[in-house]
């Protein structure tokens, strides 16, 4: 599913291609590109849920978090995101690329992925997708894009 999400992000979203593409047409194109129908459906559903996160004004689990609060990960989140991924999220919060809200959106989207081999590079792409879709995060998106395409290890020194 990550391959499809990255393909869609690079092909349609990042390249400013007209986004008024029919879902059936898009599904057919992805099938012709070699992706399996089940994975296509899951990826498109994942993107719809990402869009829904942007449309809701209040998401209950994101309310009332103080700036000084520390995120405690549940066992399922720790199983999906290793210590490197969790450390990277903390790092991005410290340099103000992610806010508590965008961090929670990222974690929500990561947990919706059906993968057993989630790695830091996958996380970086998810973060980029969330920031691109979250209004008012243009500067954070630019910083994340520089991290993704710039530094090899992803950390600014």
Curated annotation (Swiss-Prot):
Per the UniProt entry, what species is this protein from, by scientific name? Photobacterium profundum (strain SS9)
Task: Read off the InterPro entries from this record.
Answer: Smg
**Recorded family membership:** Belongs to the Smg family.
Q: What is this protein called?
A: Protein Smg homolog
């Amino acid at each position: 599913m990550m391959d499809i999400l990255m393909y869609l992000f690079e092909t349609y979203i990042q390249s400013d291609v007209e986004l008024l593409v029919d879902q059936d047409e898009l599904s057919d194109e992805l099938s012709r590109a070699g992706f399996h129908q089940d994975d296509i459906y899951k990826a498109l559903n994942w993107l719809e849920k990402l869009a829904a996160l942007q449309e809701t004004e209040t998401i209950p689990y994101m309310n009332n978090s103080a700036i000084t609060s520390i995120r405690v990960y549940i066992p399922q989140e720790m199983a999906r995101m290793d210590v490197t991924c969790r450390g990277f999220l903390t790092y991005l919060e410290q340099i103000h690329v992610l806010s508590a809200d965008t961090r929670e959106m990222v974690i929500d989207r990561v947990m919706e992925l059906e993968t057993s081999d989630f790695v830091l590079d996958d996380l970086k792409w998810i973060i980029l997708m969330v920031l691109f879709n979250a209004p008012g995060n243009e500067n954070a998106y630019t910083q994340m894009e520089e991290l993704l395409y710039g530094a090899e290890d992803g950390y600014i020194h």
